[in-house]
């Protein structure tokens, strides 16, 4: 019997993206009686909702009453998948286009082993389909996260383990979600997929790349004040919730130096107010109450040591859209050297 799949599309002002995305989904080869499509609209101000209602009556639509952010919007879909006994949930960004067999290929990989909790499709750049957007994402030991293989030439790849899957195109096993939980709703947006991938590995689930499952992404790298705040804040949350205490102490010196560097960076870019808001967030007692509560849940479910987890982490930030001489010749060598030293100490 085929596996029942819910394809979840979080949508916000998606009029420019949804026609291509939904049209490509209408051509997929997976049995039509084995999947459903759910669009969760996060209070769009364009005519996205009307477009779906008028053109895609077969698609289930949930419209939020207020803007909840990427993490909670996806969680609405994931909880729907759990409540309605789906075997899988596939998270798909609205700015994507899929190959007809993308779902068949992803499920074929996932079904090989019950310990596979997530499978990412090969994500290619829509406007330059000869280049990769992501073939599995990387985690820097200080919480930075970036797309693996970005801008590399598209080539034949083998199925392999990856550190964490891009939330733009990932198949999640509902059984695994019932164990590790959904996205952390406190994240709002950014790093929620980093955190989930980390927690999957901690709970002894595997995260794999399905190279023959292909999705195209209308990706544009952006720098913004809002993005800076959430990415800085959430990388701290990921570290504080998932590392063991001893590991946090070991990375503390490097984290302090990085904090100083990030403050100067924020000052130069004019985003220093956002950096101060991050500091303010961590001075609030309720913040630490949430962190400790989440941390207890994560550590209670832990089956894998930090010694094993950190083998997947990197000491350099290698992402072409943010490369500069300071990062390449100063920051990366220093922080990578520190990482190579301390990871040999971590035995727990």
Q: Where do the model's predicted regions map?
A:
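A conserved acidic beta->alpha catalytic loop
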Residues: 24, 41-50, 66
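Glycine-rich, basic loop-to-helix element that forms the pyrophosphate-binding segment
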Residues: 64-84
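Short beta-strand-to-loop acidic/aromatic patch adjacent to the donor-nucleotide binding site
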Residues: 86-97
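Conserved donor NDP-sugar-binding/catalytic core segment of glycosyltransferases
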Residues: 96-139
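A recurrent flexible, glycine/aromatic-enriched loop bordering the glycosyltransferase active site
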Residues: 132, 141-146, 152-172, 189, ...
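Active-site-adjacent helix/loop segment of glycosyltransferases
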Residues: 207-320, 324, 328, 332
């Amino acid at each position: 019997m085929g596996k029942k799949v819910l394809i979840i599309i979080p949508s916000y002002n998606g009029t420019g993206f949804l026609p291509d995305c939904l049209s490509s989904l209408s051509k997929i080869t997976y049995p039509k009686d084995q999947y459903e499509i759910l669009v969760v609209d996060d209070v769009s101000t364009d005519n996205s909702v009307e477009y779906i209602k008028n053109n895609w009556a077969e698609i289930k639509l949930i419209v939020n009453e207020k803007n909840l952010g990427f993490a909670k919007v996806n969680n609405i879909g994931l909880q729907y998948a759990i409540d309605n006994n789906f075997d899988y949930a596939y998270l798909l960004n609205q700015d994507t286009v899929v190959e007809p067999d993308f779902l068949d290929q992803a499920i074929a990989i996932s079904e090989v082993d019950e310990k596979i909790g997530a499978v990412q499709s090969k994500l290619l750049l829509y406007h330059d389909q000869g280049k990769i957007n992501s073939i599995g994402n990387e985690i820097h030991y200080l919480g930075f996260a970036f797309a693996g293989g970005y801008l590399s030439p598209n080539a034949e790849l083998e199925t392999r383990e990856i550190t964490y899957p891009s939330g733009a195109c990932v198949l999640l096993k509902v059984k695994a979600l019932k164990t590790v939980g959904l996205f952390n709703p406190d994240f709002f947006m950014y790093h929620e997929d980093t955190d989930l991938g980390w927690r999957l590995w901690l709970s002894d689930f595997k995260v794999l790349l399905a190279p023959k499952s292909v999705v195209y992404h209308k990706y544009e790298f952006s720098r913004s004040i809002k993005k800076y705040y959430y990415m800085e804040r959430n990388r701290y949350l990921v570290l504080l919730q998932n590392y063991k205490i001893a590991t946090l102490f070991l990375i503390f010196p490097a984290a302090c130096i990085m904090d100083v560097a990030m403050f100067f960076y924020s000052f130069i870019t004019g985003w220093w107010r956002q950096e101060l808001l991050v500091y303010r967030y961590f001075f609030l007692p309720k913040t630490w109450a949430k962190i400790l509560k989440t941390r207890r849940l994560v550590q209670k479910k832990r089956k894998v040591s930090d010694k094993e987890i950190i083998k997947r982490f990197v000491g350099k930030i290698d992402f072409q859209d943010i490369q500069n001489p300071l990062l390449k010749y100063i920051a990366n060598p220093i922080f990578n050297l520190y990482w190579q030293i301390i990871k040999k100490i971590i035995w727990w």
